[in-house]
Amino acid sequence: MARYLGPKCRLSRREKTDLQLKSGIRAIDSKCNIERIPGMHWQRRGRTTDYGVQLRMKQMIKRYYDVLEKQFANYYKQADRLKGSTGDNLLKLLESRLDNVVYRMGFSATRAEARQLISHKAILVNGEVVNIPSYQVKPGDIIEVRSRAKGQLRIKGALELAQQRAPISWIEVDTKKMTGTFKEQPDVAELPAEFKVNLVVELYSK
């Protein structure tokens, strides 16, 4: 499946929550009514089945991390093989993607922008260029904006926007040096309360 290139607002409206797909310069509800799902007859939608609820949750999490269907399925398989809760493992794997970590550290305004920075070799991991957005960051890894990219206005702007977001316990960032440390495995308790990942587990367990 190709990556969605349409209006980001439409995806947030579909899931009835802010998926953080836009830069955050303006509040999402300033032009995007997330309470109204896309379509002309949105008020006539019928009762959702259990399968429909499970599918919607999978779509919400998949779109939040901006990954493709096949990628998401592979993450689930990997999470299911690991010890512990499959649902928690799934969220930890998604949170540990390099594009997500770059976004969390505030070096980009969106995950899509983070992927672009990584693909353009503007990000270092432990001093080495990594241009794979899906690269799994490990505890102790140091993420840094490459020297030649530190003057980019979009990165400086993203760092300013990041100050408005709630801090994340598993990362530590030096905004002046544009470096950050992935201190430990993500704490799923700090992720959006809307994520009922048990529904995704139920969906894939069928």
From Swiss-Prot:
Entry's Gene Ontology molecular function annotations: rRNA binding; structural constituent of ribosome
Purpose of the protein: One of the primary rRNA binding proteins, it binds directly to 16S rRNA where it nucleates assembly of the body of the 30S subunit. With S5 and S12 plays an important role in translational accuracy.
Superkingdom to which the source organism belongs: Bacteria
Q: Which UniProt keywords apply?
A: Ribonucleoprotein, Ribosomal protein, RNA-binding, rRNA-binding
Q: Matching HAMAP family, A to Z?
A: Ribosomal_uS4_B
Q: Is RNA-binding one of the keywords UniProt gives this record? A: yes
Cross-referenced InterPro entries: Ribosomal_uS4, Ribosomal_uS4_bac-type, Ribosomal_uS4_CS, Ribosomal_uS4_N, S4_RNA-bd, S4_RNA-bd_sf
Q: Which organism is it from?
A: Coxiella burnetii (strain CbuK_Q154) (Coxiella burnetii (strain Q154))
Gene Ontology cellular-component terms listed = small ribosomal subunit
Q: Which residues form the S4 RNA-binding domain?
A: 96-158
Family, per entry = Belongs to the universal ribosomal protein uS4 family.
> Any idea what this protein is called?
Small ribosomal subunit protein uS4
